[in-house]
A protein has these predicted regions:
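Acyl/amide activation-and-transfer machinery of modular secondary-metabolite enzymes
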Residues: 1-19, 34, 124-133, 192-227, ...
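Short amphipathic alpha-helices and their capping loops
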Residues: 1-12, 82-136, 183, 189
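Non-catalytic N-terminal regions of enzymes
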Residues: 1-92, 152-177, 282-285, 290-359
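Helical lid/core segments from catalytic subdomains that handle acyl or acyl-like groups
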Residues: 131, 198-283, 290
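Surface-exposed, Lys/Arg-rich phosphate-binding patches that contact polyanionic backbones
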Residues: 135-152
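Long, hydrophobic alpha/beta structural blocks
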Residues: 179-180, 197
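A glycine-rich phosphate-binding loop feature that marks nucleotide/adenosyl-phosphate handling sites
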Residues: 180-186, 240-246, 357-359
């Protein structure tokens, strides 16, 4: 009556089925034994799709990795003969609410609500889900981002998106409608947490032009400063503490759910209009040495959301990084310019798509 909540599900696990549709489709819990995730496969690829209320990217990758371990032991007797069937030590079962255990009651709002530039355009037919991936060598990326620009790989790749968007939609972007990229930050390292529940906050990398022309070097510098100014523990703590404080407030807790839903929609719409896109970096994924010969790559996708019909994810495994864009738009100019800029910096780029743009 007052809050949504999750219960332990004792029903049989959802059936693993062959992938037959676009990823990130709605999960109908009533048709899925009340589970909010699905597992599918396509040839030698295992897919995990998760409703974000269950966990964030780090929690999802942990589950997918353990699921892959279990599958490989079933498939390859040489593994099952030497490795026990127990969960690996890197798999956490911790379900602590790390927001509650770490929030500061005195925090004030640090959110920006100014509207951002939103990408618009003709949509793919039949609710199409376009995927374009660029595979890049991590060693070369690190060399270019650090030695040439003095920034992290994450900042470099976000800058490539911002610059591509700026070049494509320059006349629509202004100080009043800046390019703003929502960047999720994993809070576990800051608070020594290993929870499998959500534990992240969003910061915004902002590019607000105040002159006619910008070079890529200038955009990189702006994005670097924007991100670094927010990457302090006190600031990150204040972001989630403000949310938790509102949730814990007695007056808010006593408001009926149907009224909360109205407020949630208003807040969601404001947040959607405040960011041009979301780019999340899952980071470098490692697996136990025994399994490495059987695993080629990890990938991650984000589904679209209101106002953000083009999103990006960054995932790396060993020395290969996958920079993935999902989009509902027919036009791929932004994605193309992202990878052109990366290639211009001497980084080898191998492109793959899911074929939607050729149908």
């Amino acid at each position: 009556f007052f809050w949504y909540y999750l219960e332990e599900n004792g029903k049989p696990a959802p059936r693993v089925e062959e992938e037959k549709d676009y990823p990130c489709r709605r999960i109908y819990a009533q048709k899925n034994n009340s589970y909010l995730f699905r597992v599918t496969y396509y040839k030698n690829r295992i897919n995990l799709e998760v409703f974000h209320v269950l966990t964030d990217g780090m929690g999802g990758i942990g589950f997918l990795r353990e699921l892959t371990y279990q599958y490989l032991r079933l498939k390859h007797s040489e593994l099952s003969d030497t490795i026990s069937d127990r969960l690996s030590e890197e798999t956490s079962l911790n379900r602590e609410d790390s927001y509650i255990s770490n929030y500061n009651k005195a925090s004030k709002s640090v959110y920006a609500s100014k509207k951002a530039f939103l990408i618009k355009g003709d949509k793919l037919p039949y609710n199409g889900f376009g995927v374009i991936q660029g595979f890049l060598p991590v060693s070369k990326l690190k060399e270019v981002s650090r030695n040439k620009y003095g920034v992290s790989i994450n900042e470099y790749l976000i800058s490539a998106f911002v610059y591509a968007t700026y070049r494509t939609y320059r006349r629509f972007i202004s100080e009043e409608k800046p390019i703003r990229v929502a960047v999720p930050v994993n809070m576990r390292p800051f608070f020594d947490s290993n929870t499998t529940k959500n534990f992240f906050v969003m910061i915004s990398a902002e590019f607000s032009p105040n002159k006619e022309e910008y070079s890529f070097d200038e955009v990189v510098a702006v994005i670097h400063d924007s991100i670094q100014s927010q990457m302090k523990k006190e600031h990150l703590e204040a972001i989630f503490s403000y949310n938790v404080s509102n949730e814990q407030h007695f007056a808010a807790r006593s408001v009926p759910l149907f009224l909360k839903n109205i407020g949630i929609k208003v807040v969601y719409t404001r947040a959607a209009l405040a960011n041009t896109t979301t780019i999340t970096n899952i980071g470098n994924i490692t697996v136990k040495e025994e399994y490495e010969p059987y695993i080629k790559m990890f990938h991650s996708f984000l589904s679209f959301s209101k106002g953000q019909e083009l999103k990006g994810t960054i995932t790396s495994y060993k020395d290969i990084l996958a920079y993935t864009f999902t989009s509902s738009f027919e036009d791929t100019t932004v994605q193309r310019r992202v990878f052109q800029q990366i290639a211009k910096d001497g980084i080898d780029v191998q492109i793959e798509t899911n074929g939607v743009y050729y149908e």
